[in-house]
Design a protein with these regions (language model features):
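Acidic, proline/glycine-enriched N-terminal capping motif
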Residues: 1-96, 104, 232, 261
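Conserved, structured C-terminal
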Residues: 1-32, 36-39, 111-281
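Internal amphipathic helical hairpin motif
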Residues: 71-107, 160-188
Length: 281
């Protein structure tokens, strides 16, 4: 329960908090000033085996979006990351480590390309929005940067695709890995990506508008009973086993991309710093 926390703009509930509390959440963490469920009635080990066999519904609203749009949106995103985004297609997701002037990792979001001049950065636990605003101002870039009203809901596990295909139709199966499409929820179009913080397969639904969140949760929960659905959260055993690091835990500002990732990175705003780190790593 979140009874021991004083809710404010610094610690925010989500559209799904009432649902996870009713389902027996045993604790929360705070990520990006928002509640993240951390444990339910089952043990971490039992949760691990369930996730590998069935399907779970996760409240990951704490994955806040930093929206960058405008004529210089692409240039600003490229300025922040060593990942070359020039060939990214609309409808594609990219993992894009964000670095500072010394090649230290500031964040490791997933980039969603909504249009040629509009991007979402689905962030880990640091204030990337402020960094983006500072760079845009300092470089004189024409870009609008803000946090949209988006609350991701994750459906993870080997039964996730079957559940979502039953609810939203077979076209769900055509969405490729790290690609996204659109589904109808309560008369609105909502973005759904084949992605998530597990290695068991699944999707993330980026719910635009908090009012649509509870209804979507209830819809998936009812349909999920046939698939042995449970509430869940990122599982420590499963994500480490799958090589999914957590910013703030396994990597921080003190690390550079060459210490964390196997593949090379190129075309950096701070190429001198990266090259220095490459030689030392």
């Amino acid at each position: 329960m979140a009874d021991g926390l004083n809710m404010s703009r610094r610690i925010r509930r989500t559209p799904y908090t009432d649902r996870v509390e009713a389902l027996g959440v045993r604790g929360f963490s705070v990520v990006n000033h928002m509640l993240l469920p951390k444990a339910f009635e089952t043990s971490v080990e039992e949760d691990y085996w369930h996730l590998r066999a069935y399907v779970q519904l996760w409240d990951v609203s704490c994955q806040r979006q930093v929206e960058i749009s405008g004529p210089d949106a692409g240039a600003l995103v490229q300025l922040m990351t060593p990942r070359n985004i020039s060939k990214a297609q609309v409808g594609q997701c990219l993992y894009v480590p964000i670095i500072d002037d010394q090649a230290g990792l500031i964040n490791d979001p997933v980039l969603l390309k909504l249009a040629e001049d509009r991007f979402w950065l689905s962030i880990a636990d640091s204030d990337l929005l402020l960094y983006a605003k500072g760079l845009a101002l300092g470089r004189g870039l024409n870009a609008y940067i803000h946090e949209p009203d988006v609350f991701p809901l994750s459906v993870q596990g080997p039964q996730a695709e079957a559940l979502l295909a039953e609810v939203f139709g077979p076209d769900i199966r055509d969405i490729g890995f790290f690609k996204f499409g659109w589904i109808e929820v309560e008369g609105t179009q909502q973005l759904i990506a084949r992605s998530g913080y597990s290695r068991q397969g699944g999707f993330e639904i980026y719910v635009q508008g908090a009012a649509h969140g509870p209804g979507l949760w209830d819809l998936l929960w009812r349909a999920g009973q046939a698939y042995n659905i449970r509430p869940g959260c990122p599982n420590l055993i499963e994500r480490i086993e799958g090589g999914l690091f957590s910013y703030g835990n396994e990597m921080t500002l003190q690390n550079n991309p060459f210490e964390i990732y196997k593949k090379s990175v190129k075309q950096l705003m701070n190429s001198n710093a990266i090259n220095k780190n490459k030689k030392e790593t």
